[in-house]
Amino acid sequence: MANKKLAFQDIILTLQGFWSKQGANLMQAYDNEVGAGTMSPYTFLRSNGPEPWGAAYVQPSRRPADGRYGENPNRLFQHHQFQVVLKPSPKNIQELYLQSLAELGIDALEHDIRFVEDNWENPSMGCAGIGWEVWIDGQECTQFTYFQQVGGIEVDSVTSEITYGLERIATVIQEVDSVYDLEWGNGVAYGDIFKEPEYEHSKFAFEESNQELLLKLFGEYEQEALDLLDKGLVHPAYDYILKSSHTFNLLDARGAVSVTERAGYMHRVRTMARKVAKTFIEERAKLGFPLLKDEALREKYLGKKGKYTKIVEGEEK
């Protein structure tokens, strides 16, 4: 690889090129506020059910409580994740990940790369899995997970998720201490694009957000999501679940909910997440699981009545 250090946008292009060759569909960032790439429907919804799936995409991820007014060198209201989800998981997925780092110029012989066991979960969305944090030269840069549950439902097929923290990967590659000193591309600094929005979003989240409005919106988003799910409209419903989740995160950052109330809000989001995951599988079953090419397996999962049948250790459930 050339000595010139990759700009932020070139890191994205390199990862897109690498993972598309491994069978991942290159998706675009989902156009709704999410706290992580996992919450995109390209991961959350598609990880359940028997259909194979592969996707890779950049996802801007908003975490209001992590805002630091643009003053912290690596903690942000909004950061960027490069998300890879492969179902079923390739047996050599860890090897592929290391190859992707090599494509970025991060040689395992020249850098300290460690897989630190870290079983991951997202309680509010009912997601959990076994996996590792990947540390490069002393900082966490990637989360590597084999999903066990999504939306509170046990997955049918082992699904692997790789979440690159792009800002942290970029600081390793460009050898800078602050994300704001990164080159985004064409000589433009990361800070020239994102430092002002970081300050403004932090000020909004911690000082200026309208708590009464947010409380009202959460309830309205929740009701709309549940109404849409009753009508079998999975994707519009999921949009409102994401809005509910982000609204809760804004309330939490503002200190507008107590510890007890916080648990209650998380339970409400988790209830919606479980319902949308279940409904998504049911709707895909009505279509005959079109991405499932194995006819015998399709028939097994659809059962005798053409409805989704959970398979557990070779038996129907």
Swiss-Prot record:
This protein's UniProt keywords: Aminoacyl-tRNA synthetase, ATP-binding, Cytoplasm, Ligase, Nucleotide-binding, Protein biosynthesis
Gene3D superfamilies: Bira Bifunctional Protein, Domain 2, Class II aaRS and biotin synthetases, domain 2
Cellular component terms (Gene Ontology): cytosol
Alphabetical list of Pfam families matching this protein: tRNA-synt_2e
UniProt main location, coarse: cytoplasm
Molecular function terms, GO-annotated: ATP binding; catalytic activity, acting on a protein; glycine-tRNA ligase activity; transferase activity
Subcellular location: Cytoplasm
Catalyses which reaction(s): tRNA(Gly) + glycine + ATP = glycyl-tRNA(Gly) + AMP + diphosphate
EC number: 6.1.1.14
GO BP annotation list: glycyl-tRNA aminoacylation
Superkingdom in the source lineage: Bacteria
HAMAP family (alphabetical): Gly_tRNA_synth_alpha
Family, as annotated: Belongs to the class-II aminoacyl-tRNA synthetase family.
Quaternary structure and partners: Tetramer of two alpha and two beta subunits.
Name the UniProt record assigns to this protein: Glycine--tRNA ligase alpha subunit
